Amino acid sequence: MIRSVVRGFGAALPKRVMTNKEIESRVDTSDEWIVQRTGIRQRYIAGEGETSASLGEAAARAALERAGLTPDDVDLIIVATSTPDNTFPATAVNIQNRLGMRHGAAFDMQAVCSGFVYAVATADAYIRGGLSKRALVIGAETFSRLLDWTDRTTCVLFGDGAGAIVLEAQEAAGTKADRGVLTAQLRSDGAHRDKLYVDGGPSTTGTVGHLRMEGREVFKHAVGMITDVIEAAFEATGTTADDIDWLVPHQANRRIIDGSAKKLGIPLEKVVVTVDLHGNTSAASIPLALDAAASDGRIKKGDLVMLEAMGGGFTWGSVLLRW
């Protein structure tokens, strides 16, 4: 059978770092409060000329270089983003053009913070279905441009950045020992759409709008939803928490990350955490964390890696893959 195997990975961050101390000068908050409630110490903020497409392009080029490939070797680009450069065309098409590609297919996916998990699942389906041989899967966000910088409940949480992986079709035995994507579990429930949303859009207000969130409601549902899709992945593959080498969660909040790991029985030393450095970068958070952990040698070839995320909608999902 065909598996979608990770060939390369890469990341890109804006030049500017914004610390909690700087946010203290903007709104009524403190470094101590932010760290205690979220685990965030800093975040990167896009500056002039830095966009979701430019960051996504840089991450894509890094992933291709790591894989020893060129844009000519890729036939599919999927970009997970809630902050596109334009309403249309897709940011993926923009990145395709920046890479000099004149072939293949490119499109965006919008599942907010779950976007990268949804995009990996979609690329895997294309590869297993024979519609793609190599796919660039990118998470790219500039959430700082959706923030109300007078709202202390949200402006402290988010940052900008991009990460990417290259998935390649490879023959496999069809067992849980295979390298590549082993299963994907996706969920959504639109009844919660008003708990985390942006109060604008082309067909309603004609404006971009600002991010709005009921933080307590999100926190209340997060751990249960996350563990649901992880347990479903275990069931689908005949694996358990003991088999996991690394849990790479969406980097939203340190308390959610720790709570999910504890409920699943996964030791914290097996959890990749970058929320302290990046803040919540939405669809970019998982590929940024993958890049960090694979670059420093923590994630190694053959490791069993669980990706999980929950985002606005609500959407949530998991991907279990062998590196």
Curated annotation (Swiss-Prot):
Pathway the protein contributes to: Lipid metabolism; fatty acid biosynthesis
Enzyme class, spelled out: transferase
Any one GO CC term of the record: cytoplasm
GO molecular function: 3-oxoacyl-[acyl-carrier-protein] synthase activity; beta-ketoacyl-acyl-carrier-protein synthase III activity
InterPro entries: ACP_syn_III_C, ACP_syn_III_N, FabH, Thiolase-like
Catalytic residues (UniProt): C113, H250, N280
TM region positions: none
Keyword Lipid biosynthesis: yes
Keywords: Acyltransferase, Cytoplasm, Fatty acid biosynthesis, Fatty acid metabolism, Lipid biosynthesis, Lipid metabolism, Multifunctional enzyme, Transferase
Cell location: Cytoplasm
Region (ACP-binding): 251-255
A Gene Ontology BP annotation from the UniProt entry: fatty acid biosynthetic process
SUPFAM superfamilies: Thiolase-like
Catalytic activity: malonyl-[ACP] + acetyl-CoA + H(+) = 3-oxobutanoyl-[ACP] + CO2 + CoA
EC code(s) of this entry: 2.3.1.180
Record comment regarding domains: The last Arg residue of the ACP-binding site is essential for the weak association between ACP/AcpP and FabH.
Quaternary data: Homodimer.
The protein's role, per its UniProt record: Catalyzes the condensation reaction of fatty acid synthesis by the addition to an acyl acceptor of two carbons from malonyl-ACP. Catalyzes the first condensation reaction which initiates fatty acid synthesis and may therefore play a role in governing the total rate of fatty acid production. Possesses both acetoacetyl-ACP synthase and acetyl transacylase activities. Its substrate specificity determines the biosynthesis of branched-chain and/or straight-chain of fatty acids.
UniProt-listed NCBIfam families: fabH, PRK09352.1
PANTHER family: 3-OXOACYL-[ACYL-CARRIER-PROTEIN] SYNTHASE 3, BETA-KETOACYL-[ACYL-CARRIER-PROTEIN] SYNTHASE III
Similarity-based family: Belongs to the thiolase-like superfamily. FabH family.
HAMAP family: FabH (MF_01815)
Protein name: Beta-ketoacyl-[acyl-carrier-protein] synthase III
Organism per entry: Rhizobium meliloti (strain 1021)
Gene that encodes the chain: fabH
